[in-house]
Amino acid sequence: MPRCVFLWLLTGLFGLGVSSAAENDLIDPADLSAAVPEELSETLIIATPHFGALGTNEFAANKSTEMTNSAIGRAPMEIKVANPVLYYANRVKAIELARNQKWQEAKPLLQTLTTEFKDDGDTWFALGLTYLGLEQWQEAIEALENALALGTRLFGMPGGGANPNDMMIRLAEAYGQMNDEERAIYWINQALNARWDDRPKLAGTSFYQQGKNPNFKAFETSEAFQQAAGSYLPIELSRDESWRYDLHYLAGEIERLHVHPYHAISVEAFKQKVNDISRRIPELSDKQIVFAFMQLLGTLGNGHNFIVPAFGEKGSFNQLPMQFYWFSDGLFVVTASEPYRQWIGHKVEQVGDMSTLKALELIKTVNPRDNEMQQRWLAPYYIGLPTVLEGLGIVDKADAVSLTLSDSRGARHLISPEIKPMSFAGFPKLPGLSTGESPLYLRNNNENYWFKKLPKQLLYVQFNDVADKESQSLKQFSEQIQQLIIEGEVADMVLDLRHNSGGDGSLNAPMVATTVLFKALRPKGKLFVLIGRNTFSAAHNLAMSITELTDAVLVGEPSGSRPNAISEAGWFNLPYSRQTGVISSQFHQYGAPEDHRIWIAPHVPVSLSSEQYFKGEDPVMTAIIGISSK
């Protein structure tokens, strides 16, 4: 397998040398076919990799219509199902056995199912996972190749996602277990060409999963594997060359991962920005280089593009010891660490010598977004990062940030808070009150989901993260709510998504079903869905699904995304600095093809002022109780 295919892409795109050692391994794109083992060349029709020179129409293409297989040329096979009733019963049983990792019991059923009916990608996928569980690697490969050719949407299975690029990684892992490095790397590269979105998992640098992938242990130190994994760093690079290597890698991952990288910036302008950053690297500090990378991502023009500059080995940021929120009447301090808690509740009038509104406007260049509600949500987060403030000219020096605050009487106070190393546990949510009892919507907004029965049979459900809890899956939680509805304990229902910025959208279906069940059993009952600036990504998709299937009443602010939007978080980890971030890898259409709304607008618009927040009031729930009682 030729090495440094990816390095060829990076250096070929931008004309920026990395090192002579790397250049010795560059290959011509015409030779790419040689990288495919002959016996594998016809197993899959893959979308054409985006290799070439910047400035071609190919690079500006929207990748959302690309497919990893072909529906043309694969004729349906003969159906050999003698007893359809028994077939269906066995299909249900076999998939459930596979879900519970009862591989030995699932295996004969799935073998029979795929013999009787060969055109169901779901059963081939379940059989492939079963063979993987039984360490029958060659059999797993054959089953997964069939699943890949047919396609599947069988989710909730252990050890493998149903997306085509995830299946390609499973194929690579099977070859890895067989110590076949060439075929393993071939399938890794196929997955990368199909925009596989968690490349750091290969190198053990994933944001969510620590440790290297054990399936590739036999050759994890080889240069070819490290190139595919994105962890290779040429030796004897200078500091500036190493940062340029990261820049090339980031630009290449934008080109590989982003579903439509040039919808907001031209190819030529993007190339110029990369060249400008490369030229300036010798004069920039490590933190300033990471800021320049943030600005590069900021040109992409949609919300799932950012760096989290908290976990890198080089260039990680500091932050101010306080959190801000943009209320209807301005930017305020909502929480702070000691000794700055006395400033909670104060309005931010100036950042350095610049007015807060002007500073917030400048933040837009590092805050790629789906709409301007996302600016309301995330601009306060960026205000808390001194390197961003310095890079945008809001302050002169990142280590000397001053804030002008005003209290409720209008008195002004100039403070210079001491910066601290950056920590990150997710983008900020509006916190509970620092003093006194918090209102219902702020009490447990770091818990994934919970509910409370309110007077007059009003059920309040707060859904904050689209992710399973260890103690109770989202499906189990939804079933618990469904039982309350069935038992007649709910007259009206509230689903609060104001703190929910997303997660795993494949988990949403049970909650959608819960809202549909409520409307079916309580046709005169009111279903309220609360939305706002934080309602984003998988949570936004949930809100769209509910509004398509029910007559839910939307209450709050406009949402933080669009019905049809470039979305999905494709993770990257830079080889030198180890900075982590995401790039938008998919287009999600939850509205009609011609749904051009810039957000989901509430039926009952309600804003939140600083006075209401600090008094512990929730004007959204006040409005709902008023409507519910009618």
Where are these regions (language model features)?
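Flexible, low-complexity junctional segments that flank or bridge functional domains
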Residues: A21, I45, N57, N69-A82, ...
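Register position in tetratricopeptide repeats
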Residues: R99-N100, G133, Q177
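Conserved acidic, small-residue-rich alpha-beta core segments centered on
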Residues: H346, E487-V494, R498-S629
